[in-house]
Curated annotation (Swiss-Prot):
Is required not only for elongation of protein synthesis but also for the initiation of all mRNA translation through initiator tRNA(fMet) aminoacylation. HAMAP family: Met_tRNA_synth_type2 (MF_01228). This is Methionine--tRNA ligase. The lineage of its organism: Bacteria, Bacillati, Cyanobacteriota, Cyanophyceae, Synechococcales. It comes from Synechocystis sp. (strain ATCC 27184 / PCC 6803 / Kazusa). GO terms for cellular component: cytoplasm. It is found in: Cytoplasm.
Length: 532
């Protein structure tokens, strides 16, 4: 059971579609979720991070058939690749939700019955253009020339004329508008909120929640000739994930501890499902609405949309194997303003990592530890933070940095968090150059030497701590080189974490005479692979 005295935080990635291996966008969203979960754990929250896979639907059935596999085997193999990528990225998720899990069927049935009993499901004829890749009917006005889908321009939408069960989305037009008005923070960023408001203002139409002639999916509880539509099934995967392993799978058990979710992180391509369909479904079942849906932008490569047909897709595992997981995590969170579209360029990737992590941070730590060994007999400076002059520039910058960076993490402004931290790192480099401790040492000014070196080491410590949600292994290396027995992948109780956070996000936690191990490089300079 959760301790009611401990604050809680729950965050989800999308349940990724397993028609193909995980791509760069999947890795991006998951790194963001993991970073935020790590930050909330640092603060002392009891955290639940949910990721997983959406495994039903026609697209998956056809993909499996093309490989001469049954759909379950295809799903099982693809799930292994997702989990392998999450391990490579050092993702510490709490639950991995699979929509083929038998327990998920129990949740879907339970939820369906509630909505059925409410009178919000009915049988009717559906005619229209259907995109298999989107698993969605499209309005004719939204299609490209020759009925191609705008999101999948290489694929034609298929004309369908079939009997389906529908959800009365139109009944929730006014309740949704009230939700958006009363809770403006529900959809973020504001550009996504405006997209949804414009869509809803055009008038909501009921949407089908079943398909005929589809074997791969859960049968409709009241009509086994129909298969439940993938989104009416997949969105409930967030609820199934809330069940403890030994709990009987029903809605009551699933919702008692962690519902409603604090934050759904998604790509903007599935915004409508999460910000319109999902809250309407929950209203119908008389369940609480999640606190926020945040739709981030798309990733491009060298300014171009990525696609197999263009031959410019980026395998995230290749990037990680070449440069390391912390390099991957840092680049995408620092360089791409979360919520907006962003670009990946490998030369810029290498340049940013070398400038920030190898040069500014890594070299600062190495040169400072080298001076400590030379000028302080290898022991940490015999200085406490309280011994420093009130006008010490690094102390002035560091004294409010924890609050500034915490605020940036709360706003999902990871770029701002990194910029604030590296303002202190760059100031540390400038301070050493300006104060020239090698000259002070020659002048016999030992106290001034130790003041300078302590100030810089404490700036590095504070920077590493505040960077740890983004680059946990790099931060662990730095903390250990500063004499702490610390691992940012290990967690204590929320109360202990809260106490540590209050101390370590503040300036002045490095002790006097800290026992410092020999300096070692923390981040090796990156190089582009040689052209073949």
């Amino acid at each position: 059971m959760l301790d009611s005295s401990v604050p809680t935080f729950s965050v989800t990635t999308p349940l990724y579609y397993v028609n193909d291996v995980p791509h760069l966008g999947s890795a991006y969203t998951t790194v963001v979720a993991d970073t935020l979960a790590r930050f909330k754990r640092l603060q002392g929250y009891d955290v639940l991070m949910i990721t997983g896979t959406d495994e039903h639907g026609q697209k998956i059935q056809r993909t499996a058939e093309a490989q001469e596999l049954d759909p379950q085997t295809h799903c099982d193999r693809t799930v292994v690749k997702f989990k392998e990528l999450w391990r490579s990225l050092n993702i510490l998720y709490d639950r991995f939700s699979r929509t083929t899990d038998p327990r998920h069927l129990a949740i879907v049935k339970d939820f369906f019955q509630r909505v059925w009993d409410k009178g919000d499901i009915y049988l009717a004829q559906q005619q229209g253009w259907y995109c298999v890749a989107c698993e969605e009917f499209k309005e004719k006005r939204d299609l490209l020339e020759d009925n191609h889908c705008p999101l999948h321009p290489n694929r034609k939408a298929e004309w369908r004329d079939e009997e389906n069960y529908f959800f009365r989305l139109s009944r929730y037009q006014h309740p949704l508008e009230e939700l958006y008005a009363q809770r403006p923070e529900f959809i973020q960023p504001s550009s996504r909120r405006n997209e949804v408001l414009n869509f809803v203002a055009q008038g909501l139409q009921d949407f089908s929640i079943s398909r005929v002639n589809l074997d791969w999916g859960f049968p409709l509880p009241n009509d086994p000739n129909h298969t439940i539509y993938v989104w009416f099934d997949a969105l409930l995967g967030y609820v199934t994930a809330l069940l403890d392993e030994d709990e009987e799978p029903n809605l009551t058990n699933a919702l008692v501890k962690w519902w409603p979710i604090n934050l759904h992180l998604i790509g903007k391509d599935i915004l409508r499902f999460h910000a319109v369909y999902w809250p309407a479904m929950l209203m119908s079942a008389e369940l609480a609405i999640p606190a926020q849906v945040f739709g981030h932008g798309f990733l491009t490569k060298d300014g171009q949309k990525m696609g197999k047909s263009l031959g410019n897709t980026v395998d995230p595992l290749d990037l990680i194997n070449r440069y390391g997981e912390d390099a991957f995590r840092y680049y995408f969170l620092k360089e791409i303003e979360f919520g907006k579209d962003g670009d990946f360029n490998e030369q810029r990737f290498v340049n940013v990592l070398n400038a920030d992590l190898a040069n500014d941070l890594g070299n600062l730590l190495n040169r400072t530890l080298g001076m400590v060994k030379k000028y302080c007999q290898g022991q940490g400076p015999q200085v406490m933070a309280t011994d420093l002059a009130p006008d010490n520039p690094l102390k002035a910058l560091g004294s409010h940095l924890g609050e500034e960076v915490s605020s940036a993490y709360e706003r999902l402004s990871f770029t701002d968090a990194c910029e604030a931290i590296f303002t202190l790192v760059r100031a540390g480099n400038k301070y050493i150059d300006d104060m020239a401790p090698w000259k002070l040492f020659k002048q016999g000014s030992q106290k001034e030497v130790e003041d300078v070196l302590y100030s810089v080491l404490e700036s590095i410590r504070l920077s590493a701590y505040l960077l740890s949600p983004i680059v946990p292994r790099l931060s662990t290396k730095i903390y250990q080189q500063l004499g702490f027995t610390w691992d940012f992948d290990q967690w204590r109780s929320p109360l202990e974490q809260a106490e540590e956070f209050n101390r370590h996000q503040s300036w002045g936690q490095l002790g006097a005479n800290q026992n410092l191990p020999p300096a070692q490089p923390i981040f090796t300079k990156l190089e582009l692979p040689a052209e073949e």
